[in-house]
Amino acid sequence: EVLAKLKKMASHNRIYEDLYRGAGAYRHYIPSLVNALSSRGEFLTAYTPYQAEMSQGLLQSIFEYQTMICELTGMDVSNASVYDGATAAAEALLMCRDPKHRRVLVPASVHPQILQVIRTYGEAYGMTITVLECPHGVLEESVLREALSEDTACLLLQQPNYFGLIEDAETLFAAAAEKKVKGILHINPIAAALLPSAKEAGAVIAVGEGQPLGMPLNFGGPYLGFMASVSAMMRKLPGRIVGQSTDHEGRRAYVLTLQAREQHIRREKASSSICSNQAL
């Protein structure tokens, strides 16, 4: 009776079999392996282990995840992930700031919910978020050059953008680099397989939302935020980083590396307060 009532209620919905809407949350095919692994109690956790010697399997899985994110983005190093794509974008802004550079340029073609999170972070950290108009759906080079200033820290682009259009990231990041402004590219991981990598486009940090890789819609989130950067920015990355080493007998071992950046050691001076991950 309950199922019949629910089906009757659901019949009022309009179902689209082929739909290109979603605004960042899309219905993708999910391999059965995903559900099989996520049902394993010893594997399903949002926490990166503190005792590396007891958790080699979990650490290896995160290390392999980091490796694949680096391959996808073309970057040198990845962290163990953050809460979602919007958080990843906001954390990337914090990586670029310094006392003399606290202005962030963001085109209006970026997802409005990402912009909301960025503004929240910016207000807390004393950063100025400048939104650039995109009358034709993409950011134009002339608009960017006019907005660049001495206190600009970074430029954030989304690829493809909120309107589904492809930004001319290479040209825009090159223009920003002339003023020593860092480039951040927020990418769709599925589209990233077809487009030039974030590093090839001229970005120094790549972030994105991992939901298209095989996560249920889950009423809009939270999902998975991935982050990767060039090696020069490595010590500013938030969250955990798993590294590969060898033990005293020469066997391969996985460890949590560069922990001096993290909040359990540096407290309020840490690069971020994030210490959990969504990589699984």
Go through each PLM region and give its residues:
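Active-site phosphate-binding strand-loop segment of PLP-dependent enzymes
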Residues: G137-I190, P212
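N-terminal entrance/gating region of PLP-dependent enzymes' catalytic architecture
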Residues: E1-E64
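Gly-rich Lys/Arg/Thr-decorated short loops/hinges at beta-loop-alpha junctions or inter-strand turns
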Residues: R40-A52, C70-G74, K100-H101, G122-I129, ...
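Active-site C-terminal subdomain of aminotransferase-like
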Residues: L213-L280
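Conserved PLP-anchoring active-site segment centered on the Schiff-base-forming lysine
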Residues: P99-Q113
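Short loop-beta-helix segment that forms the pyridoxal 5′-phosphate
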Residues: Q51-M54, E71-A90
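Conserved active-site segment immediately N-terminal to the catalytic lysine
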Residues: K199-M215
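Buried hydrophobic positions in well-ordered alpha/beta secondary-structure cores of metabolic enzymes
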Residues: E1, I69, V104, I118-R119, ...
